[in-house]
């Protein structure tokens, strides 16, 4: 399947870089080979003919363009339903391949411009470098110490691709990267091409859409592929590059100065506003899926790091604290410890990290005898290993791969991402009316209370930061925030729960009234207590889509800027620093 043609206004307007053009050409040719193998020359000829006519329909000569469009319509009308389906799938696969090539070309271009002494524009490392250059190292370090970067995973409402399709596309991108490796010999290059044809054939033969609409847990599992393949590995690289930028581009072998400032959030499995399929049971299962993925990733990473610490006790003796950790391990699990010691004789740091990996696996399996009670307990063990290595003069081992693992534990914990709950204020008002009236509660009210109980259960297992944000959609009064605290008291019979109730202002009227509403929110005792705990930090959400529907996109944008300006002044007046704004920039059409 060819990739370019002449005579097109679009081709002239969007000229591909040569390396991208070569990738697209190779992928198009490979797809053509797959189509020929599947349906013979006739299928490929139909696809090519439609492609040529479609390109010609954009010709600068309007008569040529109109004739080509008419011929294309006639061609499609002549096909059977099965042939039309095959051609449509061929073009779908082709566009997937072009997108994969474009994404990889962007990565290739970014890598080409990435230098240790000159970080890429738009990155955290570049921001750190700029601040250090303009305001000094100490100022940059101070800003990093207070930084929290919090990307939130959401389910894309228009994402219809199956995970199998996404996986195949990702494998094809990896093969494009492998093909660029200059170390490949002729046989390895041929094998890469064979694997590319195999993956394109898989993509062609895989049904592009699910038979059933994906449920919330399907969406959670889809998001986990991004964590498994990208986020878990990229986050420590972000820290490492920020560390280098803070050091002026120089390599360091000292204790890192960059804290773990990334904390993931997720609305998938927690956002129930308008979605009856997101129940308390779904929220519980969503967290279980998240935890399983992060624990598997940590176990694998810990095992890899441990296997690399083949430093014997003669050259790198264990410090006092690490000897205590090892003694505790031997007393708690003598058989496991003996097995590890036999495989790693006289290698105390290796034994300690591999023992930690075994405990992570036990935590995932819910093996109470061996599991960790918290991510903090794992961090304590890893830091004991790190301190021992540093004390023995093995700074490269202390602050190398082991530091990357520590950053991962600090960033993801045992829960991966904070699961945020969102519900409409009207649902809370209706639930409180039922509770105050007495009598039998409706299923919807019981579900509201059950959700809060699940939040408490998640906090009990993974810590308060695993599920503490409760977003109130369409916040219109102070009572809408107070309602969540009152519902929590009913749900838990007064037992404590850590809650950050986040007001979400969405309409033009609510944006205009937000400062007055927040004046009342500040008076709530639960909010006062939380401000004292956090150094007077507060999160506020400003909605975009519904305000745009309410007053129009231009007026909504102005209202958002005005609201943020007034909220900043309000926060300064009440010594709330910093105030965090989250903008929901959802589609308006």
Predicted regions and their residues:
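Hydrophobic cores of alpha-helical transmembrane segments in multi-pass integral membrane proteins
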Residues: 32, 567-571
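Generic beta-strand/beta-sheet core signal
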Residues: 265, 270, 279-281, 419, ...
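Conserved small/polar residues in nucleotide/adenosyl-binding loops
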Residues: 582-588
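A conserved P-loop NTPase coupling/switch region
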Residues: 494-498
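Often metal-dependent polyanion-binding catalytic scaffolds in large enzymes
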Residues: 1-437, 444, 499
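Active-site cores of enzymes that catalyze phosphoryl transfer or operate on phosphate-rich substrates
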Residues: 394, 399-482, 486, 490-493, ...
